[in-house]
Amino acid sequence: MKAVRVHAFDAPPVIEEVTQPVLRPGRTLVRMEAATVGHIDRTVWRGSFLKHPPFPYTPGVEAAGVVVASAVYASGQRVWLRGSGLGTLFDGTWCELIDAPDEALGLLPDGVPAAIGAAFFSPSTSAWVALHDVARLSAAESVLVTGATGAVGSLAVQLALDAGADVTALVADAAQAARMPSGAKVLVLGNEPGSSMDSISADLLVDTVGGGVLAAALARVKPGGRAVLVGYTAGNTLTLDIAHFLQRDVSLLPLNMFRREPAGRAAAPDLLARLADGRLKLDVQPFALESAAQAMDWISQRGHRGRAVLTMGR
């Protein structure tokens, strides 16, 4: 079967023929239909993750497909896959057939396309857990979301609106502003992030980008408010004036989805139902399995919309 293989940190991913897996106890054989290319895959590939599979390895933490053989799932059932060491401890999902740990699978409703099933878990559960488990969002609170056209940011905007919050979405330009859902206030980020946000005051900040944008957005959180830190694509450092920070009394709340994955899995069926009936929308950008390197490059570019997904041709 075909699989994407990585032979060294930062080495270009290549397509190779590898031996097909066989069914083992505690595992399910799944024919892949779509596999996500995410920032965690890049982190492992660059050698910046805490662990990595032995070289050469097949990347891929998330995917969707159809069960071929299992002691737990019926043959032909549609499933999504995520975590349990996939792509971080052993070979992952960028392949045609995988033997995945049974606990990594969840049922995928018929109304959800495979590409969405592969891509939904990380951004939708991150947004849900950030708002409801970490921040404890209440209806009618004001919420500022940075990186609002990214996968997590866009879903945070949608879920906060659905919860009855007053939402302001921070975007990079007018073209991105036009893509925001109705009901959200939209603020275009200028060359000076701080001055762009002068008119904003929020009970809760959901920051998906980090860096200078986070520093500027923190100043717009009301005293006693909260800031959930989700991502760092714009920079992984934050400098604080401690005296000023103590006076403002804003709680900095990190989102660690490895620790909170049980909460994400509990929310997954409801989130999939919302994606199936259109209450939630998630953009995906398809790439062929052979184009994994291009997909890795695409997600590294600022301003990309949605998630990259490798699709397996029949």
Regions found by a protein language model. Give the residues of each.
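Glycine-rich phosphate-binding loop and adjacent beta-alpha segment
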Residues: A163, G212-R279, M312-R314
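NAD(P)H cofactor-binding loop motif with strongest signal on the N-terminal glycine-rich segment
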Residues: G147-A148, V209, Y232
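Glycine-rich beta-strand-centered segment in the early N-terminal region that forms part
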Residues: P21-V37, S48-L86
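N-terminal Rossmann-like NAD(P) cofactor-binding module of classical short-chain dehydrogenase/reductase
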Residues: L205-V206
